[in-house]
Amino acid sequence: MAVVQADKPAMDKLIPHGVQGDQSRIDLDDEQTANAKAIIAATKKTGMDERAAVVSIATALQESKLENLGHLGDRNDHDSQGLFQQRPSSGWGTVEQITDPEYATTAFLKGLKQVDGWQDMPLTKAAQTVQVSAYPDHYAQWEQQAADLVTQHWNS
């Protein structure tokens, strides 16, 4: 039986609606783990809570598998780059900015803050409102892994 440490965020706060649908999980390498930690650090720096970090990490898992992607040539979705696959042509920032994990996370969170009631929405709806993806339901599959990462790294 796992022992829950008092200083770890509670799962009911991280996943207030329960996970939506089937969950995916990938093994993370050191770079991907560092990017998850960078998202958490940027979330804390903006004064947002653990749920915001879960939404952010789940979004980055869907968009880039937590890899800070540069331009992929023919495989690129328009001019999308970075952890959140943000587009310079859509006003997210310069290529240099959106491939900086702190900047990209802060930009995503700025968008999330503008979504009325995001804290009470299912993760996939909150993420989709910011990202405007062609696949709006795909964010939900990463909620458990994102919550696990926040639990593991929020206080580290």
Where are these regions (language model features)?
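Flexible domain-boundary/linker segments
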Residues: S56, A60, N76-D77, K125, ...
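Peptidoglycan-targeting cell-wall enzymes and recognition modules
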Residues: L14-D27, A38, S64-L123
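Hydrophobic single-pass membrane-targeting/anchoring helices
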Residues: M1-Q5
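Catalytic and binding regions of secreted/periplasmic enzymes and modules that target cell-wall glycans
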Residues: I98-S156
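A generic structural motif
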Residues: T46, S90-W92, A134-P136
